[in-house]
Amino acid sequence: KTTKKGIQYYREKQDERSLKQSESSLEYWVEQYQKSTAGIWLNFNTSFTEIRKQFEAGNFVVAYYKADRIFTSVQPKHVEKVQLKSGYAINEMPRTEFIKYLLDLKMTQALAISGGKTDKAHTIAIWFEKFEQLLKQIFDDESVKLVFDEETFQFSIEMDGREPFDFNTLSSGYAAILDIVVDLILRMERQLNRSFDFAISGIVLIDEIETHLHLELQKNIMKLLTTVFPNIQF
């Protein structure tokens, strides 16, 4: 009996010690979290379970962009089918395939025209028209044109008073904007089926959004983002 009592006493002490350690650890991590959020707490009117369900179905976007944003996209030497995903993890970078996706769209449009699929070809033509309009908003210049060279399979941007340039030779300010815009477009594109209506909901965190932007862009960047992506919480 004495032995059993001793064992029980030891277990109770161990459980008590373990509980105190757990409480201490929990208090530490809560304190660290509060420090990292600077006292800011997020409250959602939807459960995390529902958010996760929508995210996994591709109906909710979660993205994070660092302060040192530099847009880079692979320049393809030949046509390659881009397999867009219905959803991307926060650490994935679909924007790296953007130029490949543009080329894929152009070839799909050409095949649709030759195959008599006029509705499909028209949908893609409208997509490119709307993307060109978006570029005009970003550069704040109505002379902006997106030009495709059928010989080299390369896209370039042309505007009055400047030599043509491509997506990988943008100034740091415009590269920082396109890094966000293009990435979000591709995160939503499969679900929207080329509608260019980026109405999917989501949460996007941008570190030092004004970095690299000149004064005019700093004033207009949030208006641009919330107009193009009306249901994203930036």
Language model regions located:
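P-loop NTPase switch/coupling surface
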Residues: 1-98, 126, 140
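Amphipathic alpha-helical domain-onset/packing element
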Residues: 59, 106-149
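Residue-level recognition of the N-termini of beta-strands and the immediately preceding loop/turn
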Residues: 60, 144, 199-203
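A structural signal for short, well-ordered beta-strand segments and their strand-loop junctions
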Residues: 63-66, 143-148, 156
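Short catalytic/ligand-binding loop motif for oxyanion handling, primarily in non-cytosolic enzymes
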Residues: 71-75, 97, 111, 166, ...
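Short, compositionally biased low-complexity segments
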Residues: 93-113
